[in-house]
Amino acid sequence: MTLLTRLLPALLLPLSLSPALLAQESDTLPGYRSLPFTLPADTERLLLVDADQDGLTDVLAVAPSRFSLYFQRTSATGGGFDFSAPDTAIQLEGSSIGWELSENYPDAAGASRFSLLALVDGSRVLQWPIRERQFADPIDVLSGLSAFAGAGVNRLHFSRDINADGLDDLIIPGAGTLQLYIRNADASYQPPLAVQSDMQIRTNLFVRQGIERDVGQALRIPLVALRDVNSDGQPDLISETEERFDVFLASGSGDYFPQSPSYFVDRLEIRERLGNFDFDQLDFANLTGMLSLTHEELLQDVDGDGIDDFVLREGGKVSLFSGTTTGMDFSQPRQVLRSSGNVLTTFLHDENEDGRPDLWLWRVESISVGDLFLWLAIAGSINVEAFVYPNEGESFARRPSRQLTVALKFPSAVRMLSSAIDIREQARALEEATILPTAIAQIGGVESTRDLLVLLEDQVQVFMGSMDAPAAAPDDQFLASLDYSRNRNEYEIDIRRFIDEFEIEQNSELRRVEGRTPEHRLALPVAMRNGELQVASLNGDVHDDVFVFLQRGRESLSGLLLLSEP
Amino acid sequence: MSAVRRPLGVLFAALLLGSSAQAQPNHMASEIGLGEWPDDVLREDMDGDARLDLIVPHWSAEAGRELLVYLQDAGGHFPAEPSRRVEIKPEIIAFALADLRPEPGRELLLFAGNGVFSLSSAIASYTDNLRPLFDWPLAASVPDRRRVLYLPGLPDMNGDGHADLLLPGRDDYGLFLGGPDERFTLAHRFSTINQELDPGEVPLGGARLDTQLAINERQGIVLNVRALGASAFEGFLSSWQDSDTTTLLEAEHWQPAAVAARMNDDDQQDIVFMNIGNDLYGQINILQQDAEGGFAATPDWRGPIDTRGDIRLLDVNGDGRLDVLRILDNSNEWTVQFHLNQNGSFRLDQPDQVMRFSGYDLTLSVTDIAGDGRPALSISYYTIPVVNAVRNASIVRSQLLYAPGSEPGEVFSARPAFRLDENFSAEAVRGLSAQIDLQTDLDGDGRRDAIALAPDGTLTARAIDAGLQFAATPFWQYVPTRSVLRFDVQDMNGDGVADLLLYHSTAMTLLVSTP
């Protein structure tokens, strides 16, 4: 942390109190309307939606079991928002509510409406269409379910178009499974397809000694992967768990997906074949020999026919299987390559720039227990080698055409541990630091620059044109991290550099405006406390709109919307 | 580690004195597969024969989640195949074990998202077996597909001999007192969250970090870490269509944990929890059980505590009441603060004793070595002398024992009564797999012994004398045929003789004493 960074907030604050030096304080920005808002304290989030489908963005406030919509008025009706009361709101009853929004459901009259959908208590799905800027009566979408959507009210991305027919389908989470309901044109659903899901669940219900720990549950359920793997133009379903790799090919007739996978790989069987880890079988002179127990599966088009093929690595053995329009030919591998040494991983990437993916096989050198003990106290290095097997059309070359070496250099474990403590101390020191909330937005009309907004306790300061417009995303190439080129085979990653150069930036944007006078100062109606600036685009003009969140307390949360006037 | 285990008899010592290269003939050896979660293997009497049985959690693609029960027979033998298989239905989130029904042995308490059930493992089916006990919205609502949680150590809050339940709910805790005929009564509800605190005042944990790992051709890997101010509106505003599409559901809900423990002199179990106080500091809260078995609506005692470091409850002075330890680490520098329980209150601003240690991966426990109710402090840590590491690739494990304090104001003596520095090289790595066990009186002399894995993987036991010194040579050793990664010592068949549970990589060996 530099001295300058430390002093910046302190420098800015007195400046803000010197009217002679600064622009006149006002209650809004030129070309903007200032719309204060006070919302119920239990409001958990605001979602920007176009609920009445008029091209203007509206605000949906989500509180436990209560959904409130604030519509943006058109210029003909005065524009802006009326935050004094929601334009429409509904209260949902239930101990477990998973909700989602969609534009792909018809209302009772058959017209496609923006709708709120909710999986209520895991048993039924209800739809509330928005009609004439009001939540209409709920429509039963699906019932008789046995689902788990977590306790309380949670966003559940369960309504999406799985089969690309323009109708939203439903993905209902169960106990370790997902039930896929494909919606038919007549609003009925095909028989559900159950696919396994590796949910990430962290649960703690009990502590013994460490009373600083919390009890509860954290949950993440990944979505299923959908893409066309057999080149028939229809999305297929790829379901991966620890035990299986299943592919369900879309069928041309009848139900969209078959009830059992079109093809699969049994990962448990592979692990059984490779053998389980056994400490007594461990070679202390070559711990990386354990990699022979690892496997990986790649589903990707190798031969360029548009149909994904299957690359299976088991230890150092790589098998290539051919994909067909109706499945995968697992009867006979098209090719088997065997590598000695400790194979770390494989992937497909075009190395020779012929437009075809080549096989990269990465090996790591032997690491012994003695090495590990040594690296506890002194810095070390591990060489990782990549062997590139060029794609010859139907299969890969028998021999690698190229070998790369990446030297991974790292400090001793003791040094890393001490660096981790330093980083922790840096982070802890931030608790004492003043970090001002900032946002970069386009307030003025200059396309090539951006403006900096700084949220102080009693005002927002705006430094016009002080920031660069965001640069186009760099055209990073594969292995750019190594300064990769086809002409170079030796590379190095030095973790020591990260540690040496590590620094937590504070108030970095403020450095750009050091010594400058803000062009605008906006007085705040109430003092900011743990507030935040958020930039949005609500009315489609070239100017950003800004939410100034000021404070949340026991009774309410308050803020200000700076809405550009087109 | 602080739990007091009953002294084990002399028979074991008599049988084991001297060295042996294989399992003792007076011990029945059994081996069972460990499955995926060796740390979750339980030991309880499931059939009421006063012998401990083994319960091994298991998952398979065909059968889903199961508890495999291996019943110990009269000869101390465990079968190779499970005696009982208990199916865990998909709705079940957690289970506990308690003696609920008149039939011998322990039953299962099954916790679903909205209710608690009982089940006997002796009946092979849920039909005519599963009994709903009471409704309760558990703090966790989604079960894990492969694993079922275990709730250990059900307290007997009121000493009536029935297991009670202190259960976290969605928003608060419920204390359910057990009674005959599987009856549970909701006796008290309380929140571990400070309800007096305005949400706007709750500290937000200081600055947030925005970490970006970028890759560009000019600078290679660039790690950019930026501090963001504390915000009460993190993630508050988003666009419906910008949402993350790789996740179906992401949710979490946590609250401070509560612990049932004896905190004052009345021999009854109280409730302890930690939260944020009105002064925005950490706060320890004690709900004391009154003479009628009730609890007040608000804590009987509160005290502010600096929440940095690990805060543990442990009876360090053997008075039967839990004390507070605060352990701070700074790389290889450790500070341990002891706050003694003063009949249900603490001086948390002033530790009763502060001790400092220098080493890595410090482990702390208290153990009543002499069996006189005055525990000693056991400290273990590692040091990495660079010369050792370079010369022969080795590290040092230090074991220290501190006698109970003899000076006023001392919980433990300021200087260790015993210190053992062991050098472990790469060839001796097997000896590092388990810490020295100081909880068992193996030779029955009324004093705990030091049971440890020697550098070659041999399990050894050495006596500890009145001065807390380890004997120079072991009085017992056992050479396992397979590497031991962890071991436990427990009387499995109620004969007062210590039995051994040796955990290998994929299986465990049980050595149970036989007459």
Report the location of each language-model feature.
Chain A
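Positively charged n-region of N-terminal signal peptides that target proteins for export
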Residues: M1-R6
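Beta-propeller-forming repeat regions
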Residues: A23-P566
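Bacterial N-terminal signal peptides
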Residues: L8-S18
